[in-house]
Amino acid sequence: MAGLEVLFASAAPAMTCPQDALVCFLHWEVVTNGYYGLGTGDQPDPNDKKSELLPAEWNSNKELYALRYESKDGARKLLLKAVSVENGMIINVLEHGTQQVADLTLNLDDYIDAEDLSDFHRTYKNSEELRSRIRSGIITPIHEQWEKVRLSSPPREFPPATAREVDPLRISSHHPHTSRQPTWRDPLSPFAVGGEDLDPFGCQRGGMIVDPLRSGFPRALIDPSSGLPNRLPPGAVPPGARFDPFGPIGTSPSGPNPDHLPPPGYDDMYL
């Protein structure tokens, strides 16, 4: 029982009753199972310090002992309460994460000799049995329940983020047009609208805020260079310039198609 005698020696000056000696043993058993003592009371305190020793004023209330613990890996926190009842003590332990509760009732006369509480070798009796009961009644149930909860809810795994996250509001870069569209760049400021019309070599974007040629939606295959009566020569319309076709849509070298529904008297020159 390494460490128990050292702990007892540090706490012996404050021991005045068998309950104190039993709580000292309880504290030692909890610490040897991977915990640090934090402090007294139900609620955390700014002055809490992790220690293997009993905290200050740990036995100020002989009727109700309340001690808080934290596991060395920080995963579990315990609240231990020991209530004095006649010639025994009821031990209650709460694990905050799982809300698991374990309790144990001990008879003081079975494990504590109250004749001389200053002598470590005389104070405790049946120490192995006491240690076994604490482990089976408090430590093991708390740890088993915590492991069960941890294994039933494994941590979620997220795939690594891609270089470009999918934005559901982004307009698709796929264009159903047969011709390749120039790269669209937004104006640097609202006052830049139409600025490309002043640049004879500007071929990166149009001058309109809403450009029907770059809207991202399907459009009719209208040739913007069509003129009257024939097509304009190549280069007549600067790339990216605002241009409204001024000739019949769909003209071809063979000439326009005849009207399929001529108006009445269309061939009467005197009409």
Curated annotation (Swiss-Prot):
The modification N-acetylalanine is found at residue 2. It is found in: Cytoplasm; Endoplasmic reticulum. Its main location: cytoplasm. Signal peptide: none annotated. GO terms for molecular function: endopeptidase inhibitor activity; proteasome binding; protein heterodimerization activity; protein homodimerization activity. The modification Asymmetric dimethylarginine is found at residue 219. InterPro entries: PI31-like (IPR045128), PI31_Prot_C (IPR013886), PI31_Prot_N (IPR021625). Pfam families: PI31_Prot_C, PI31_Prot_N. The modification Omega-N-methylarginine is found at residues 205, 231. Residues 2-150 are annotated as: Important for homodimerization and interaction with FBXO7. One of its GO terms (biological process) is proteasome-mediated ubiquitin-dependent protein catabolic process. PANTHER family: PROTEASOME INHIBITOR, PROTEASOME INHIBITOR PI31 SUBUNIT. Belongs to the proteasome inhibitor PI31 family. Plays an important role in control of proteasome function. Inhibits the hydrolysis of protein and peptide substrates by the 20S proteasome. Also inhibits the activation of the proteasome by the proteasome regulatory proteins PA700 and PA28. This is Proteasome inhibitor PI31 subunit. It comes from Rattus norvegicus (Rat). The lineage of its organism: Eukaryota, Metazoa, Chordata, Craniata, Vertebrata.
